[in-house]
Amino acid sequence: MLLEWDEEIKAHLMWIWGGEDGFMKRKREGMLVVTEKRLIFITKTNMSYRIHDVHSQRQLLRFKEKKNVFLPIEGYGITELKNDIEKSDKNTVFTFSEISDMYFVERRWGTELKVKIDIENKQKNYGFAIVKGWVKYPAKDPLLFHHVDWNPIVTLFKMS
């Protein structure tokens, strides 16, 4: 799935816990990248651990300072995004035309972005949340989630 060169990354979020909703479906850690025409969930990336950690810490700092977290990150453009998409089949690309609905739900533990996808007359539901803290043993799982206003992403989708 090739991206057009005129697309622009609107938001790049780190520490995302997301995937398909449903019985016996395990979500994964990844990055959520939003362009003008697509929502992309990247679980396998060419980004080094050190660079990923730096951008994750910057995002955490923006949360603490109550600043806008829906920003692209420096040094990560369309070329890097294309390379990451091609790296693994587990990296998921949803065009806005495939998305039938996008909204967010405020829960006790955090805010979750819900996305309904229509692929070949089948509807699938996905959920994404920004992680605040992790537990690493016995398996890496999220411990806490951020309460986020997902309106900038939902508005971008509805205006497209």
For each predicted feature, which ranges?
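The phosphoinositide-binding surface of pleckstrin homology
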Residues: M1-K27
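Acidic, Ser/Thr- and proline-rich intrinsically disordered linker/docking segments
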Residues: L3, K27-E29, I42-S160
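Broad, structure-driven detector of short, well-ordered beta-strand segments within folded domains
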Residues: G30-V34
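Structural motif
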Residues: K37-R38
